């Protein structure tokens, strides 16, 4: 390869990480590259475990040994050679922080620029008068003096302040010794050494003013210089206060000037960056220390059901024989203050809620009630009662704003910083576009505002217009977190880097995909190499270069099936990706939709941005909840439906989101299951075969073998989790990890068992010539074939439990494969397989899936839909939150939310079948579904 070419490509030779089969390829630099292929084919092994791992390892190894000990240790990937690799940055689909101080604003650095902006051009307003707080300089006072015509009689005075322990007489003597000769007392000018003053001081408590200068206004330089000196002296003697008395038309007008930052008798703190930082003691609210929440009385525990009125026992702590007396007194006085005792709590105005909580002189409010319990908590019954209603609640001092009150006095265009960070990003972007500033403010803030607007634009372009900067990073979904990191990367303007992204389209509505593609192209155009592991059709078609890995998954994958541009991909015969893009393979639309009569209904859903909506979820069919990102899908399904059903059926669970009630045919369900993409186990000991309970039967089968029975081996001897049959040298791990302080840990195959995890005598037990280790090394497909034995009940049970793994498309994974190596999509399908192995339900379950197509290829989605249909055939019900049009078109019923995200969402746009939705012009989802649904039918 020529030197010129070597600089333009990343060359990989002999990559053998996980299932990669010694692959070699050249990846063009400064291009948008998509790596496609089935789930488990080796995409992440190439992108993250090979390219990113090597790029990061080389960077870390370039640092000193001292610096390396503080960084995560990265092992060298199993590859012969990689050349031409730039510094690598991985943006994965996971929430990287659970820090309660981390917000969207801080992670994107927009908040840092906002702090700087408020420190530079923010204006402080007095909370008492609402007037702007100003600090006068000497030149301000001189300009005021010079604003009068020549000859105007004026006088510069300074108030005389007595320090502790100083008498008026002592102060006058001190001023006299400094060279001052006159003071003003009750509008009379008197000499300091006159006897008259001493008499006045003994009689009157009148305030003294020191006469600094008397003059007639002139506009020559000498006069203005004299005034400046006098004003300087007045500020020094008057403790930062200066008075200019103007005599005009037989009137005396006094104007006060202060070089202190004060107004209405309050001295304010001058705006600075630290004042607006909730991570700094100078800016954080002293009560909650910048968290926005404190441990206190939780409103949600005091009023658990907000659909009830005070009369109907909405207040949980005012129930019971003795405590109901407080409720009776409140109701007795309610009429006097026009409090609506029959109105549901959630409909009460803020004024009425304050009355309930703070009470009045006529009755005790909830706050006083809990203060009383606090005083009596030395008694066990009061202590127990108080603990029932304690939880994390909004800080009463800063009201969740995180900053001390002084920071809220500073405004830009009538907006405080906490008000700005609470706005959705779309409205915040609009605010900065319409910002009206003075010429001076514009010059000072031009660069800061440019940086803010650029970063806000990137967030809008990745489909996050509905988020606010105050949103906690820990509450974001994996897709949202990834797109925020992507926007932050664009804002940093890095060049010459390798960006590796894991399915950035997760959680993104088809409407916003083209915006994401533009962001990826912008990142490329800055001079970066952008590698995206992706299944989205539109993103694949937009790539400069496509690498398709396959042909299938697991041991049947790990090969480069195709490498080239989009046009060349259409002619790739072995590529499943090509077949689906060319419509040679496709996911068929169901010929009929399932009818439903039973349902679960949520009434008055108000959580987050939901607009008090009523929703019916049909049972015994496949229901898909769709809508723009941020339209309220998760709030409705995961925030209200799931916890409400869990609490109703089991009596426990997280607090459901705000709603009136949940009704319908709940009695027809035995349980509710949330099937998410969280790992099924994080330890190296956890594996799919133990999760689906097939390993219990395999161990039992080996314990039944003659050699095992002769030696008294029980099923526990074939477990690598407990002592008995496992190798004690490696404790059943098969490997021994040697910790290296400055380098990556070295993993060595256990010399005692040669990586086979069990003792030699246990490995002597064979079934059909294979040991327990040999069985764990088999794939699901191989194991099903191996255990075909019609005469054995145990092998029948094993096959029954393994078959669902094959049905959900996981036939390629090894039985003993560590769960920590499974992708999110694979973990979700393992969970699905566990339910599929159960026989037809006597009392069916409701299964809830949140974007089950994450990480799935078209071919994987086809198998997933077959599994869904199998669940439905067994009498279960499905509710799916999804953006993928292949799943939406195969649904029986769709609940479309919107019309947009954030504050413009939270409504039900449409409910009905896919065909009806595709014809509904008001739905954004419907417009995209129309082309998918009817173009596919035309092809048929």
Could you describe each region identified by the protein language model?
Residues 1-940:
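Conserved phosphate-binding elements of NTP-dependent enzyme cores
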């Amino acid at each position: 390869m020529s030197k010129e070419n070597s600089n333009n490509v990343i060359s990989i030779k002999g990559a053998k990480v996980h299932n990669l089969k010694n692959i070699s390829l050249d990846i063009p630099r400064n291009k948008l590259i998509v790596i496609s292929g089935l789930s488990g084919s080796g995409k992440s092994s190439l992108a993250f475990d090979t390219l990113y791992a090597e790029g990061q390892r080389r960077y870390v190894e370039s640092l000193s040994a001292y610096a390396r000990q503080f960084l995560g240790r990265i092992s060298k990937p199993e590859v012969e050679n990689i050349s031409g690799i730039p510094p690598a940055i991985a943006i994965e689909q996971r929430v990287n922080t659970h820090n309660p101080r981390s917000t969207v604003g801080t992670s994107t650095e927009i908040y840092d620029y906002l702090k700087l902006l408020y420190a530079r051009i923010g204006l402080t307003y007095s909370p008492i008068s609402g007037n702007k707080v100003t600090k006068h300089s000497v030149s301000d006072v001189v300009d005021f003096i010079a604003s009068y015509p020549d000859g105007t009689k004026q006088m510069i005075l300074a108030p005389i302040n007595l320090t502790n322990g100083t008498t008026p007489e002592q102060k006058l003597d001190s001023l006299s010794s400094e060279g001052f000769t006159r003071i003003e007392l009750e509008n009379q000018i008197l000499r300091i050494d006159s006897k008259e003053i001493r008499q006045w001081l003994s009689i009157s408590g009148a305030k003294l003013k020191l006469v600094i200068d008397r003059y007639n206004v002139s506009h020559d330089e000498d006069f203005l210089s004299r005034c400046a000196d006098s004003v300087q002296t007045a500020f020094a003697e008057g403790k930062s206060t200066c008075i200019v008395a103007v005599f005009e038309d037989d009137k005396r007008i006094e104007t006060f000037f202060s070089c202190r930052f004060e107004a209405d008798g309050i001295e304010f703190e001058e705006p600075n960056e630290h004042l607006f930082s909730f991570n700094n003691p100078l800016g954080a609210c002293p009560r909650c220390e910048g968290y926005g929440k404190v441990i206190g009385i939780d409103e949600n525990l005091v009023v658990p059901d907000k659909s009830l009125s005070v009369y109907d026992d909405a207040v949980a702590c005012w129930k019971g024989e003795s405590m109901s007396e407080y409720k009776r007194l409140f109701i007795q006085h309610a009429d006097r203050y026009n409090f609506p005792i029959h109105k549901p709590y959630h409909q009460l105005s803020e004024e009425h809620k304050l009355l309930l909580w703070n009470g009045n002189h006529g009755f005790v409010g909830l706050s006083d009630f809990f203060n009383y319990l606090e005083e009596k908590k030395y008694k066990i019954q009061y202590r127990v009662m108080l603990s029932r209603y304690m939880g994390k609640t909004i800080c009463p001092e800063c009201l969740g704003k995180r900053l001390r009150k002084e920071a809220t006095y500073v405004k830009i265009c009538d907006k405080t910083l906490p008000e700005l960070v609470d706005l959705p990003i779309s409205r915040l972007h609009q605010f900065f576009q319409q910002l009206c500033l003075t010429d001076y403010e514009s010059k000072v803030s031009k660069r800061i505002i440019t940086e803010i607007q650029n970063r806000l634009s990137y967030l809008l372009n990745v489909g996050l217009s509905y988020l606010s900067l105050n949103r906690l990073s820990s509450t974001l979904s994996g897709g949202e977190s990834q797109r925020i990191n992507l926007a932050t990367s664009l804002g940093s303007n890095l060049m010459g880097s390798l960006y590796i992204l894991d399915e950035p389209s997760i959680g993104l509505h088809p409407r916003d995909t083209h915006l994401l593609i533009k962001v990826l192209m912008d990142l490329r155009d800055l001079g970066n190499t952008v590698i995206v592991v992706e299944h989205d059709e539109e993103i694949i078609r937009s790539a400069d270069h496509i690498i398709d890995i396959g042909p299938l998954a697991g041991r049947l994958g790990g090969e480069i099936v195709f490498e080239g541009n989009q046009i060349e991909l259409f002619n790739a015969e072995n590529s499943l990706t090509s077949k689906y893009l060319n419509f040679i393979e496709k996911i068929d639309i169901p010929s009929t939709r399932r009818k439903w009569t039973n349902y679960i209904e949520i009434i008055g859903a108000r959580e987050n941005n939901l607009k008090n909506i009523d929703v019916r979820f049909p049972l015994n069919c496949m229901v898909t909840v769709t809508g723009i990102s941020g339209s309220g899908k998760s709030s409705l399904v995961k925030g209200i439906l799931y916890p409400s059903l869990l609490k109703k059926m089991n009596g426990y669970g997280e607090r459901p989101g705000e709603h009136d009630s949940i009704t319908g045919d709940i009695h027809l369900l035995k349980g509710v299951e949330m099937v998410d993409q969280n790992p099924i186990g994080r330890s190296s000991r956890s594996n799919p075969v133990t999760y689906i309970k097939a390993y219990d039967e395999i161990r039992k089968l080996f314990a039944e073998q003659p050699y095992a029975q002769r030696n008294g081996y029980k099923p526990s001897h074939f477990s690598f989790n407990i002592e008995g049959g496992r190798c004690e040298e490696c404790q059943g791990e098969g490997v021994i990890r040697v910790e290296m302080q400055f380098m990556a840990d070295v993993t060595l195959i256990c010399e005692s068992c040669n990586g086979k995890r069990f003792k030699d005598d246990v490995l002597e037990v064979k079934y059909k010539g294979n040991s327990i280790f040999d069985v764990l090394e088999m794939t699901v497909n191989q194991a099903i074939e191996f255990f075909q034995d019609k005469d054995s009940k145990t092998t029948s049970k094993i096959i029954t439990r393994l078959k669902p793994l094959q049905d959900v498309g996981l036939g390629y994974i090894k039985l003993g494969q560590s769960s920590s190596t499974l992708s999110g999509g694979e973990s979700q399908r393992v969970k699905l397989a566990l339910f599929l192995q159960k026989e037809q339900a006597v009392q069916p379950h409701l299964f809830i899936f949140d974007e089950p197509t994450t990480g799935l290829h078209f071919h994987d989605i086809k198998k997933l839909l077959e599994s869904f249909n199998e669940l439905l055939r067994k009498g279960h019900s499905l509710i799916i939150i999804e953006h993928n049009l292949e799943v939406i078109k195969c649904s029986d019923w769709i609940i479309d939310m919107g019309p947009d995200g954030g504050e413009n969402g939270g409504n039900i746009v449409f409910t009905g079948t896919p065909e009806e939705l595709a014809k509904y012009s008001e739905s954004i989802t419907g417009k995209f579904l129309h082309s998918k649904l009817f173009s596919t039918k035309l092809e048929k």
